[in-house]
Design a protein with these regions (language model features):
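Peripheral, non-catalytic segments flanking oxidoreductase cores
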Residues: 1-172
Length: 172
């Protein structure tokens, strides 16, 4: 469903532009619409989060990263796929945190009191080929993710790397 969305023309994707998402930080951004280390990223993407209506107390209070998601008309199944995926990945995150707690000789539910109602930021990125004649690096510059836990899935194209002991290692 995500690939189908990214295949749409920019005018259609722009209907759910992040400029409509406000403090909730939801919606689509174009290639170059985000900067990392001051350099435009060679990706486009969509931001989603926990689905909260306008009447939710955090939304009414204007708490950043809280609010309704912006879903496109097409593909029609993207909404259901994203909401189901976020629920499942949130459960995976809880399981990972339980494993971390156990590895630290803590109770498996040690993180629960701080993560009972997590702020979920779910992003889908598309890295199109660089434009003809482009000589710089393409993708996203070196950075550190924020938040407690980042779970990543990449397609068969690859390209994701992590820095370990000062050297870059490809992630399978």
């Amino acid at each position: 469903a995500a690939a189908e969305f990214f295949d749409l023309d920019e005018d259609e994707k722009d209907r759910i532009s992040m400029r409509h998402g406000g403090r909730a930080w939801r919606g689509w951004f174009p290639v170059g619409g985000e900067l990392t280390s001051g350099v435009p990223d060679g990706k486009e993407g969509i931001y989603f989060g926990s689905e909260l209506g306008h009447d939710h107390p955090r939304v009414r209070a204007g708490v950043p990263l809280h609010g309704p998601n912006l879903f496109p008309e097409r593909p029609a199944d993207l909404r259901d796929v994203v909401l189901e995926w976020m629920d499942r990945v949130t459960e995976v995150g809880r399981a990972v945190l339980s494993g971390i707690a156990l590895s630290l000789d803590l109770d498996a539910d040690w993180f629960d009191r701080w993560c009972a109602d997590p702020t979920v930021l779910f992003r889908i990125f598309h890295y199109p080929p660089p434009p003809p004649g482009f000589a710089g690096s393409w993708g996203v510059a070196e950075h550190t993710d924020y938040g407690l836990l980042t779970l990543l899935v990449q397609d068969d194209t690859g390209g994701l790397e992590v820095r370990v002991d000062g050297r870059w290692v490809e992630v399978p």
